[in-house]
Every structure is written in C-alpha cells, then in structure tokens.
Amino acid sequence: MVNRLYTLILSILLSISAIASTQPRLTIVVIVDGMTQDNLTAMRPYWSAGGLRLMSEEAFQTTATFPHQVYGGQETTATLMTGTIPAHHGIMADHYFSRSERKPIPILHDKQASGIGTHIQLSPRDILSTTVTDEWRMLRGTQAQIYAIGLQPEATILMAGHAANACCWLDAETHKWVTTSFYPEGLPAAADEMNMSGRIDLLAEREWTPRMDISMYNHPTDKERKRGFTYFNKEHLLHTPVANTLVIEMALALQQSKQLGIDMQPDLLLLQLTTLSPQSASDAIESAEQEDMYMGLNQDLGFLIEQLNRRIGKEQYQIMVIGRPVKGYSTATLEMANLPVQRFNADRAAALTGTYLMAIYGHERWVDGGHGPFIYLNRI
C-alpha cells in the first residue's frame, strides 16, 4: 500500500497590491477544494481573462508541506487555519467515534449550539488551537469585522474560528444560507435577504452543460466525448460552478452591507470554493466537467476582483487563494503508474486489533470501534 504524505499546497498567493505601501483594509482568504498547482498549469491557456490571470501578472506563489496524512476531510482546513497539526488543533477528520454513544459524531458537534436555518448543531469550541481569525481579533480588536462564507458547515466554521462576527454556509438540502448560534451576529442580514430573494433557487434551477464544444476540452472522458455532460444544479448544487458563484455573490453582498474594507480598521473575509465536480474521483483533472469547474472559478474570481476594484480600490485589499487537497490521486491513476493500491477497512482493523489484544491481555473489549481511517481503543 502506498502511504503518500500529500503536499498541502498554498498554491496561489494573489497579492492584489503587489507590495502595498499601506496596509490593506480588507484581506480575503479563499480556500479552493481540490485545486492543485498542476491543474492550474494545465489550465493556463484559458487564463487570458478572469481572476486566475493574476498568476502571471501580480501573484506570488509558494507551497507548504504539513507532516500529516490527508484523509479527504476538513483536517487540512484546520491545519491551514491554525498553522499546526491535528495532534495540536484536535481536528483529525470530519467525524470521530463517540465512545459514549458508540457511533460517529461530527467533529464540531456541540449540543450547546443551535442551528439557524438547519438542524445540525456545530461550533468551533472543540478547535484546540487559535486560528487565523482568532489571532486577527486579538491583534485588531473588536472594531475589525471578520466573516466566513462556505459550502460545507465544518469548513466554514473552521475558517471562522472562535472570533468571527458571523459565518454562513449553503445548506445542501434547503439551498439556503444557514449558520450556527455560536457567533454573536447569527445569520447575517445579507444572507437572509438572499434567502428571501429567490436568487439561489433561480441559479439552482439552471442546467449545467459544457460552456464550449466538448472537442475543445483537454481531458474529456469517453462518455463526455459522445454525449458531453449535463447536470441539474439543484441535485448537485455544491459541486457545480453555481456553488462558487453563490459564494462570491454572498461575499459581495456582505461586503456592501457591512462596508468591509471601507474604514481604516483592517477586515477579514474568508471564502470556501471548489473545483470538484459531481463525478470527481481525483484532485487531478480527469474530465471535461472538472475543466469546466476551473473555468467557472476563474470567471467568478474575476468578477470578485472587478467589483472590489470598483468599490474599495485596487490598493485597499489583498486576496490569498489556497488550494486544499481533498481526493489526491484516483485509484485508476495510481494503478496506471503500477503502484500497489489497497483500501483500509476500519471495522475489520478494529476487529482484528481487538482479537489480538484479547489474546495478549485477556477477554475484555479493548477496542470500542472504528471509523474512517481510525480505530478507537477503550481508553485514552
């Protein structure tokens, strides 16, 4: 079995004000699920216009490697936001196995928090380290405004940290902006207004098809070559270009309503976007629909930059875009390279470990259970 330590890529640092003589009034951190440097290089011919053209104009790029395995969950988001590893920040996956309830529980589950517009109860209370937003608050004080907008609840809360004014994410079931009661502001008024406006439903009802002839894509699958691809956004909303569009529109609505970046107190806005399509089996581009996701991302970032330039001025803000690994390489890609591929079964591993420990230490339930890539012993 190949045990790869993925490189966590801070793949693009887009400094809009190249080396600004004054401190930017607004900093925007954009985490893009599945975005990699290799994909950006492959897609470069498409960047004659749009936000990602800044790669070759005003961007500084760097990479960072974190010494822990990537399991496809939000442990990487937590590492990015805290600057430390799961052993210290406490977020090792999306779920953990509860010894008391004997079942998987969302890693950020909090019975003290209520969902606003959603039934799930989540909060950042179990993040053990300070996050970027926490440090920002301690450094800038209460006058700084901090918001996070995302596609998944765990990612959005991890970006918001303990100290944000508010956060909101797009609920996969209701197609509404929702949040947690943990943050003092609750659901931002701009999010509630978009929920009521019908804008989300309007975009969700649209059909997603290739934006150009399928022969012009570099990586169409055999199926796509024959029939292209078609998705109804409502069914796969969080994995279509519309999801990114809605996050960008929400960000701009929030910037306008809260006047982010207008006064001299630096504000912080964090966004989660994605390049992963409904059929993505890998972070690497393996289909036309994944290429189309990158084209949509480029367009949405371009719109964000255009609007911010008009509203607050190019020198008054900066954007950092970070690629977050999620799926790594697909099984087919690894096998193509003649690498041995096996799958870890947590339940089987837990059973075998329990049998082994009983043979050594006596008949007792030494293993409580397993979930994901982890097994849980009966004591810490």
Range-by-range predicted roles:
Residues Q23-I28, E58-T62, H88, G141-I146, ...:
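Loop/turn elements at helix/coil->beta-strand transitions in domains of secreted/extracellular proteins
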